[in-house]
Amino acid sequence: MQQTIQTTLLIIGGGPGGYVAAIRAGQLGIPTVLVEGQALGGTCLNIGCIPSKALIHVAEQFHQASRFTEPSPLGISVASPRLDIGQSVAWKDGIVDRLTTGVAALLKKHGVKVVHGWAKVLDGKQVEVDGQRIQCEHLLLATGSSSVELPMLPLGGPVISSTEALAPKALPQHLVVVGGGYIGLELGIAYRKLGAQVSVVEARERILPTYDSELTAPVAESLKKLGIALHLGHSVEGYENGCLLANDGKGGQLRLEADRVLVAVGRRPRTKGFNLECLDLKMNGAAIAIDERCQTSMHNVWAIGDVAGEPMLAHRAMAQGEMVAEIIAGKARRFEPAAIAAVCFTDPEVVVVGKTPEQASQQGLDCIVAQFPFAANGRAMSLESKSGFVRVVARRDNHLILGWQAVGVAVSELSTAFAQSLEMGACLEDVAGTIHAHPTLGEAVQEAALRALGHALHI
């Protein structure tokens, strides 16, 4: 029997939430052990956020190169480009390797002991990993989430999840994406730009159903221009003889020949396989219930990130992980962000931060809503990307900004400014009175605020 490891903080899960909590705990001098059954970095770093953005970049570069085989207003002409998808995947893997190696180095630098293996929780103070017992004062659950599977579309062979989609050995002729949310559309657009025929099957009547139709309209238009077929209001029935079967709810059946089917219908908290049942924690649906300090219903047992429910975002998990480490160190902290940015890396990109016009209305708030189109922004024109807009939502009485939304090229990079303005309690006058560099996409942020005040300059 191996000697029991004693520690103050034991973290299960080395994803963004878990490793950030460990790094901060190490900085604060808290003895910390991190247990991870797979590669450090979790879903985000290995099979999610980072590799998907790398593949999206490859797809965009190939798509742009392919455009220039025909006459271009930019005056650029090239021969037909060729794609080595194996080399593309290797480049993507190299980025992942560098980042995961960096995480390991940071953990070592701050004195965090990393134990590789799957944790089995014995009680709120003890965990076992491959026969090694670890005893702790604080247990932090950061086990993440997993892809939702459909019983009529079991994974295997031509039916894949986002994990397999991010490491293709060859491109399919026809990829059918089941799910019109952000994961399905991000990958579907990437595959289309890489040269595959792509169809999207969505049970609801529109794409990106968690966003309002005004925001998603430019994305729908882009999908049409790219030649991606949308089959909305269709429920999947199965896959047989090389065809995806779906019905439209009116008695009609859809048959789509497909050599690859990507199931992208969401994610669920990962609570199985760790013996968490022994803790008898209070649940919030499929997620572990937490309070404003990320504490569960059991004293000194904490939960952060996807396992604690929506919004399932890496930056939320990171912020929670940092906070929990500081609470354990004795600092007074609460997780009460003014807003958490949600970003969809489609073409064009979509960003939502804070309250939308509909949410403000539902809460009985009297608001000013104003938007500024990228068609009137010089930088957007120079990027050949005039579609989309920036929209601001602010209280009518005191002009306090409650929310920002944007759709357009590279608007993901505006998300920080949006979140910061809400966190700092900015009013329309604060943003409108800030000199924005010219020419930048950020000028549309200032112009939206100016328009809300009744005097936009460039429209």
UniProtKB/Swiss-Prot annotation:
In the UniProt record, what gene is named as encoding this protein?
lpdV
Disulphide bonds annotated for this chain are: C44-C49
**What's in the misc comment field?**
The active site is a redox-active disulfide bond.
Q: Specify which residues bind NAD(+) according to the UniProt entry for this protein.
A: G179, G180, G181, Y182, I183, E202, V236, A264, V265, G266, R267, M312
Where is it localised?
A: Cytoplasm
Oligomeric state and interaction partners are given as: Homodimer.
> Which sequence ranges are marked TM in the entry?
none
| Name listed for the protein in its UniProt record | Dihydrolipoyl dehydrogenase
